[in-house]
Amino acid sequence: MNKTVFALSMLACTAPVAAQDISAYMPGEGEGIVYFLPKTTLKVNIIATRISYKPGDLCQYANQYLRMNNVSSEPETYWEIKRVEVCSAGVPDSTKAYIIKLKDKSAMGNVELTNEGLIKAINTSAPEEKAEEYVLEKPQKHENPRKYMTEDILIAGSTAKMAELTAKEIYNIRESKNLILRGQADTMPKDGASLQLIIDNLDKQEKALTQLFAGITAREDKVFTAYITPEEGLENKVVLRFSNLLGVLPANDLAGEPIYISLKSLAPIPVMPEDKKKKKLEGAIYNIPGKGKVTVSYQGKTCFEGELPITQFGSTEVLVDDLFKKINTHVIFNPETGSILKIDKD
């Protein structure tokens, strides 16, 4: 059946069709353009941050010389949940396959489908779908502190002496910045741009040398995705698990604590009676999605709560064939829900 769908979808995108009679698809029914309406799957994205700490070479002297408390001398790596997002995604519904048969008394033209056979547009081209993008935190490059060590620091005979001299250099850098900012330096920058350049360079030196005491903390975001099929009465289903040491884990990995998802139908659209469903479908069939309230929680706290379109909670309707007689009607569908986004007439 899939081969038929893809072959016919290519036909739809390249060759105009004079007219159509749309009906539920049955294999072997004859020539035509087969398309699917989507059903909803919930896409759960968990953005987690991996935090790695590497102690500095002079960490044991951090409190003594720089009054920095609680500086660890042990490397550490752990994870945090940054945020959770849930969105609706459409996948072909095998129970909603339709065929557009050719006939002579309609002005319906090209039919555009997705690669999966979902309907996108009739008599026009659907706009390009924007890819899902997240601004993720990435590890920053750190300056090599040895670039800013004085000769006295480099030839120091002991770690303790090196720590003492490095701390003095840090205080000298701070004093230089203060003198410049107060306008008390022997040689002042000529303009604001020069001033900023000097301050930025002094900040870079101070940060690099301070890392010898405070250590380096690197943060990196990762996106973990799980898919859930919506169903009425979905409550506290384990979608993924999370461990501070291991990060985001599959739902069946008991090394992490569960992340739960719940779904509640909101004002579902009445389902069409069976006798009306059996009526001949004359026109383009599309979805009217219902709505669902989605909640994701972890350790008793809500991480995400929102309303999303759910096709399983809605119904289907027919865009009557009369719209395509004698006039050119353009229709754009939402391939994620199968609903109509826009209708234009020439």
Located regions from the model:
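Sec/Tat signal peptide C-region and signal peptidase I cleavage site
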Residues: 15-19
